[in-house]
Amino acid sequence: MAASVELAAHIKAHPAAYADSMARKVLFMVFEKPSLRTRVSFETGMARMGGYAINYDTSTSPLGAGKESLEDTIRVVSRYADLIVARLYKHTDLDKMAAHSSVPVINGLTDLAHPCQILADLLTITEKKGDLGGPTLSATL
């Protein structure tokens, strides 16, 4: 986790060095739960790094209407996208996505965890405190 926080700090300090790091890459975003910060963060990050983000609105899609299975949707989507981020009601659905995807799936939030928020919080602590050493941190769900 510390390596991820260090990389995030480096990207934040030197954005020009990463301007093309996602060139020609496509991020597919599946958000069952509405989001402002998570969605904008991923879309902005992809744009600033030269990639593209596609938002899939489950409320108006065959998946959301129950006409297409999650497994089939992800199998198809992972043929087009390089990366998937999912913000879902059930963590078990995230597990299904990961099992049926041929590309990495990022947990953008589930009923079990919000790891991207944890990483953002750890980056903030590092920026304010200088490192992650010291008191033990814990979170309640």
What is each model feature region?
Residues 1-8, 36, 40, 67, ...:
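Electropositive phosphate-/nucleotide-binding environments in soluble metabolic enzymes
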Residues 1-40, 44:
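Positively charged, low-complexity intrinsically disordered leader regions
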Residues 10, 21, 35, 39, ...:
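Residue-level preference for alpha-helix termini and adjacent loops
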Residues 14-17, 70-72, 124-125:
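A generic local structural motif
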Residues 26-80:
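Active-site cofactor/substrate anionic-group-binding motifs, chiefly glycine-
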Residues 74, 82-141:
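Anion-binding alpha/beta catalytic cores of soluble intermediary-metabolism enzymes, centered on
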